[in-house]
A protein has these predicted regions:
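Thiamine diphosphate
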Residues: 1-5, 13, 20, 28-32, ...
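Extended active-site and interfacial segments that coordinate phosphate-rich ligands
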Residues: 10
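Ferredoxin-type iron-sulfur electron-transfer modules in oxidoreductases and energy-metabolism complexes
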Residues: 25
């Protein structure tokens, strides 16, 4: 557990064999761990996984479907879309780890107060997006 550590993923990007992830939900963590075991022990890839996990207490949804697995491993997938009646504008919101909850709160404010449509993306790994 590393409190207020905002730079470890930046440092991990400098190591070619390191795959760094910042999951928001337990199902994301499970998918990443399963992929890590397959990569390192089944396929014999020269890599290791760096995972950040948190101790903040919040609801953990179930895996929304098999369709999100690829996005979790590749680093990003759409988590939730909201389109209020009369929406004329649309934004994309990104979040990882516990910050994803703040993106979801922002999504609700944008919909309720400003009638702005949005999609929240769960970014499980910014480094894997490169």
């Amino acid at each position: 557990l590393q409190h207020e550590d905002g730079h470890s993923h930046l440092m991990a990007m400098t190591i070619p064999t390191c795959r760094a992830y910042d999951p928001a939900f337990a199902y994301e963590l499970a998918v990443i761990v399963e992929e890590g075991i397959n990569a390192m022990f089944v396929r014999g890839e020269e890599c290791y996984y760096y995972l950040t996990v948190y101790n903040e207490n919040y609801d953990m949804p179930a895996l929304p479907g098999e369709h999100v697995r690829e996005g979790i491993i590749k680093g990003v997938y759409p988590f939730k879309t909201v389109t209020p009646d009369g929406a004329k504008h649309e934004v994309q919101l990104l979040g990882s780890g516990v910050i994803l909850n703040e993106a979801l709160r922002a999504q609700q404010i944008l919909a309720d107060k400003y009638k702005v449509a949005s999609t929240v993306y769960s970014v499980t790994s910014y480094p894997e997006l490169k």
